[in-house]
Amino acid sequence: MRSYEKSKTAFKEAQKLMPGGVNSPVRAFKSVDMDPIFMERGKGSKIFDIDGNEYIDYVLSWGPLILGHTNDRVVESLKKVAEYGTSFGAPTEVENELAKLVIDRVPSVEIVRMVSSGTEATMSALRLARGYTGRNKILKFEGCYHGHGDSLLIKAGSGVATLGLPDSPGVPEGIAKNTITVPYNDLESVKLAFQQFGEDIAGVIVEPVAGNMGVVPPQEGFLQGLRDITEQYGSLLIFDEVMTGFRVDYNCAQGYFGVTPDLTCLGKVIGGGLPVGAYGGKAEIMEQIAPSGPIYQAGTLSGNPLAMTAGLETLKQLTPESYKNFIKKGDRLEEGISKTAGAHGIPHTFNRAGSMIGFFFTNEPVINYETAKSSDLKLFASYYKGMANEGVFLPPSQFEGLFLSTAHTDEDIENTIQAAEKVFAEISRR
């Protein structure tokens, strides 16, 4: 068994300093019933904790590090730009460069606004949708996470298409009432919602691949159906590609599935590991944003040279071939883990999209939040602890996906499969 004594000590101190001892809830490792592991450094596909333990990393800072940790070109570019200044509160040329690259690769984006987080991007996109259409309501999907903005922290009530209830204390019911929540991958529910509220729905926001219920791809025709319905009612279709952007495909999920939204939210990968967000879309809509239009949005560190540089150097290194390699690595990982899970009688289902992988402890197809919740959470917790002990770092939640990077090697994949074999063998003996 590995020692985590230094992590335990650090966590005890952190609990006196921060709510729950962490700066983001999932990092507390509560769903796997263990104390969090404190990390010290990373290189390539590996991450190292403060006790000196080494892991193959499939968290990758929750997605941004698509090139792996401390990529040489990204690090060198950051060193150079930091010598000139970390932030100016004035425009820089690197903002133009990253914007051009995003516009070139993301089909829906004609104009883009940089911000500092994914939450900021989605909140701004919703304000824009409401301001542009003159409507109030937003339709979202159960289990799709769009950051912690008040109008998006909503769960579904009873019935097929209901007005939301706050999912967190501190979210006023008045705000929640303007959010409609329906099941993911259920077009009929969307149609019913529009029949009832369509004239007041400003936009539909959706993760084109749901990444916060464990990676759930859209079913055939779902995204196109959303496109058709929103066009019929004059609502905006907003793709939240904070997670899927440049992870599903070279041209993002919208390029892969061939459905173009009105607005797109980005983050994670486009910052290369630094805080970032962006939203963009059709010029006629984006030009409503201040200072060219009346809809206000601003940010002190928006477009800061560090994040722009890291994002630019990251995207420059991604090619269409990168995504073919992600598919090959994912194929081998799924094949190997499925084989050993089946041999030990472990229920399991894989969902995948580009470099994103969902692994559930159920034999049932996972197509929405309800089916995702059928996964055996106790089994997941046992698997998580076992894999960590074998040197594989996974997201400490069943409802988060695994991420591949260009730094993951064939040896990493085989070692992960071997670790899973040991863990499943131990679980099956209990």
Curated annotation (Swiss-Prot):
Keyword list, A-Z: Cytoplasm, Isomerase, Porphyrin biosynthesis, Pyridoxal phosphate
Q: Name one Pfam family in it.
A: Aminotran_3
Q: In which pathway does it act?
A: Porphyrin-containing compound metabolism; protoporphyrin-IX biosynthesis; 5-aminolevulinate from L-glutamyl-tRNA(Glu): step 2/2
Give all N6-(pyridoxal phosphate)lysine modified positions. Answer: 268
The listed locations are: Cytoplasm
Q: Which GO terms describe its molecular function?
A: glutamate-1-semialdehyde 2,1-aminomutase activity; pyridoxal phosphate binding; transaminase activity
Q: What is its main location?
A: cytoplasm
Which superkingdom heads the taxonomic lineage of this protein's source? Answer: Bacteria
Q: Name one GO biological process term.
A: protoporphyrinogen IX biosynthetic process
Entry's EC annotation:
5.4.3.8
Q: Which GO terms describe its cellular component?
A: cytoplasm
Q: What top-tier enzyme class does this entry carry?
A: isomerase
UniProt record similarity statement? Belongs to the class-III pyridoxal-phosphate-dependent aminotransferase family. HemL subfamily.
Stated name of the protein? Glutamate-1-semialdehyde 2,1-aminomutase
State the organism of origin: Bacillus subtilis (strain 168)
